[in-house]
Amino acid sequence: MTKFSLLDHESVPKHEIISEGELKSVLSKYLIEKEQLPKIKVQDPVSKEIGAVVGDVVRITRKSQTAGEADYYRLVIE
């Protein structure tokens, strides 16, 4: 039996953990603190699949009719 990957499903946008350098850039761009980012739980199936841990920030790249692609950021919480 093969394991199904959530990330391979067409309805699931691309998720990836960002580096500290990219995080600093995002926070300064939006003039916010890390804790002000929207949240995603560490128990979320996609969080588990990408190996996210509490405190990581995940970039979600979604298709957009107006922008082509749009990035969203989520702070991983317990």
Swiss-Prot record:
- The protein's Enzyme Commission number: 2.7.7.6
A Gene Ontology cellular component where this protein is annotated is: cytoplasm
Q: Which cysteines are joined by disulfide bonds?
A: none
Q: Which reaction does it catalyse?
A: RNA(n) + a ribonucleoside 5'-triphosphate = RNA(n+1) + diphosphate
Q: Which UniProt keywords apply?
A: Cytoplasm, DNA-directed RNA polymerase, Nucleotidyltransferase, Transcription, Transferase
Going by the entry's taxonomy, the superkingdom of the source organism is recorded as: Archaea
Where in or outside the cell?
A: Cytoplasm
Top-level EC class, please?
transferase
Q: Is Disulfide bond tagged as a keyword?
A: no
Question: Which is an annotated GO molecular function term of this record?
Answer: DNA binding
What biological-process GO terms show up in the record? Answer: DNA-templated transcription
Q: Which InterPro entries match?
A: Arch_Rpo5/euc_Rpb5 (IPR014381), RNA_pol_subH/Rpb5_C (IPR000783), RNA_pol_subH/Rpb5_CS (IPR020608), RPB5-like_sf (IPR035913)
The answer to keyword Transcription regulation applying to this record is no
State where it is primarily located: cytoplasm
**Can you tell me which family this protein belongs to?**
Belongs to the archaeal Rpo5/eukaryotic RPB5 RNA polymerase subunit family.
Q: Subunit details for this protein?
A: Part of the RNA polymerase complex.
Describe its function: DNA-dependent RNA polymerase (RNAP) catalyzes the transcription of DNA into RNA using the four ribonucleoside triphosphates as substrates.
What protein is this chain from?
Answer: DNA-directed RNA polymerase subunit Rpo5
| Organism of this sequence | Methanosarcina acetivorans (strain ATCC 35395 / DSM 2834 / JCM 12185 / C2A)
